[in-house]
């Protein structure tokens, strides 16, 4: 929870500067290949939108920004965009304004950082709800994915409707959340090792940086695929321009 709050504070403080900095932005194309509707979300850029199977959504994000994208499931909203979701809920709003509720599979990004590099990762620190693949238009940059059906394998004590909570979200103890006396020395637990086995390229818990954070020269566009198989070019219905991406 503390990690999510810190992330929100950092991104909110940066937004007002970035919007007027004149830095060229990059595109994030979010595509739903799931056999059901997903309500995509992005903060502090994007907000939220309903994506039926095969639909996609383009969000332009300014250079230098930090943020996250994720998918929500089991949602119901009224005409004013108010309601709730089983996973990834944003305080009952279609147009997200906060970090989103647990559990949710996250794509986290920080653009044009040290030596003009982008930093990006798939995070399961808040748990898992959807399979996710991330492909960059710069083909020299690593495609990352979490394509295991974790929900079907989730330990009973972590299982919720449509998702699998992290141990931190489920138990909220220092050992699982890497807080208090575990802030500087927080080894993996049996639960985080479960997530790591299922998705080796994703953050399995808060201190999983060495094997889970990836870099790419700034300026690359991103494609986020919900429920993609990760091994073929996808087809989607979208009003945006042609694909720049090839999934290896």
UniProtKB/Swiss-Prot annotation:
Reported tissue expression: Mainly expressed in male and female strobili, and, at lower levels, in roots of seedlings and saplings.
Sugar-bearing residue positions: 235
Induction: Induced by ethylene (ethephon), salt stress and salicylic acid (SA). Strongly induced by arachidonic acid.
Top-level taxon in the UniProt lineage: Eukaryota
Gene3D superfamilies: Thaumatin
Signal recorded as keyword: yes
Pfam families hit by this protein: Thaumatin
Cysteine-cysteine disulfides: 34-227, 75-85, 90-96, 141-216, 146-199, 154-164, 168-177, 178-186
Residues spanning the signal sequence: 1-25
Keyword annotations: Allergen, Disulfide bond, Glycoprotein, Pathogenesis-related protein, Plant defense, Signal, Stress response
A single GO BP: response to salt stress
Family: Belongs to the thaumatin family.
Functional description taken from the UniProt entry: May be involved in disease resistance.
UniProt-recorded name of the protein: Pathogenesis-related thaumatin-like protein 3.4
């Amino acid at each position: 929870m503390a990690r999510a709050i810190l992330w929100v504070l950092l991104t909110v403080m940066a937004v007002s500067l970035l919007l007027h900095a004149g830095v060229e932005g990059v595109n994030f194309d979010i595509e739903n290949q799931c056999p059901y509707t997903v309500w995509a979300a992005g903060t502090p850029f994007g907000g939220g939108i309903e994506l039926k199977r095969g639909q996609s959504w383009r969000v332009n994000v300014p250079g230098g920004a930090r943020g996250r994208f994720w998918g929500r499931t089991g949602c119901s909203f009224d005409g004013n965009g108010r309601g709730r979701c089983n996973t990834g809920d944003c305080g009952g709003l279609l147009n997200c304004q906060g970090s989103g509720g647990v559990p949710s599979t996250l794509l986290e990004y920080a653009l044009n950082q040290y030596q003009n590099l982008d930093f990006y990762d798939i995070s399961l620190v808040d748990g898992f709800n959807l399979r996710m693949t991330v492909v960059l238009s710069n083909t020299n940059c690593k495609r990352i994915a979490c394509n295991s059906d974790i929900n079907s394998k989730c330990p009973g004590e972590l299982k919720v409707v449509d998702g699998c909570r992290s141990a931190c979200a489920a138990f909220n103890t220092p050992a699982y959340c890497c807080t208090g006396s575990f802030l500087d020395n927080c080894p993996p637990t049996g639960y985080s090792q479960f997530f790591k086995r299922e998705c080796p390229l994703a953050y399995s818990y808060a201190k999983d940086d060495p094997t889970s954070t990836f870099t790419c020269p700034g300026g690359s566009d991103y494609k986020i695929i919900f429920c993609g198989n990760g091994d073929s070019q996808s087809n989607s219905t979208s009003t945006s321009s042609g694909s720049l991406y090839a999934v290896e």
